[in-house]
Amino acid sequence: MKIQKNAVNVLERTSAYLRAGLLTKQPAWYNVVASVPPLKKFERVPKLTNPSNDRINGQLHSLDSSAGNNGMFKTRYTAKDRSNASKQLYSASKLTYIEDQLREIFYKQHPWELSRPKILIENNGDEKYDWSHMQQIGKPLDGESVVQRTLYLMKNKEAPSLVLAYDMARYEFYRLRMQQHIEEQVAQEEAEMFGSVFGPSAIEYGIQKEQKVIDTWKRKAIIQTEIMAARRINPSESWATDEKDPKKNDDIEEDVEEIKL
């Protein structure tokens, strides 16, 4: 099948039309396409190695000396094995970074750090921080501070291994976080001393709402338990009591309305 290249040559054809006078006005996309021209290399180049870890792509796995589930030994590669290996040469390599591994470890060990509020600020990505110390101006203390501090210690060879560098950054993070908690607690106590009144926090408010639902459920459960016990003792009287005393049913309906509100 012949490769179609008309769309790729749109810049050259448009330039020729402008010079010949066929187009009197330059298109709005002309300068953009001229600064970033489309790729004209259509052949598929095999990716022999993964750039992130220098692992060889398309390499067949070694044959296992142990028997499989069916009790048979595999002594040679099948056509499917060779096909899967060749596909890896032309597929995009999965890039891995040490920063992602450090983030995964940190937030797995400290899941409550993810519950802290985040400020999403649109920036250009050119922010420069001095990671010779963890506390930064204009950046809150979080897990990313531990990651960047660990990389700084490794890059400047202040730690012999990645594990020790991570531990050093983590302990420094603990000290700063405890200092931050003490400062917030002292500031709150000083404000209360001068008459400030603080309402419930988000967690306390959620617990209060949850407790209301639990209390409502408890009252309904007690009423239903009494009804079931009465029916087991004397079924005929229990049905008559329910018809004569609608107060319990009204209480249940009020509880349901409270939950809906």
Swiss-Prot record:
Component of the mitochondrial small ribosomal subunit. Belongs to the mitochondrion-specific ribosomal protein mS23 family. PANTHER family: 37S RIBOSOMAL PROTEIN S25, MITOCHONDRIAL, SMALL RIBOSOMAL SUBUNIT PROTEIN MS23. One of its GO terms (molecular function) is structural constituent of ribosome. It comes from Vanderwaltozyma polyspora (strain ATCC 22028 / DSM 70294 / BCRC 21397 / CBS 2163 / NBRC 10782 / NRRL Y-8283 / UCD 57-17) (Kluyveromyces polysporus). Residues 251-261 have a biased composition (Acidic residues). This is Small ribosomal subunit protein mS23. It comes from the Eukaryota.
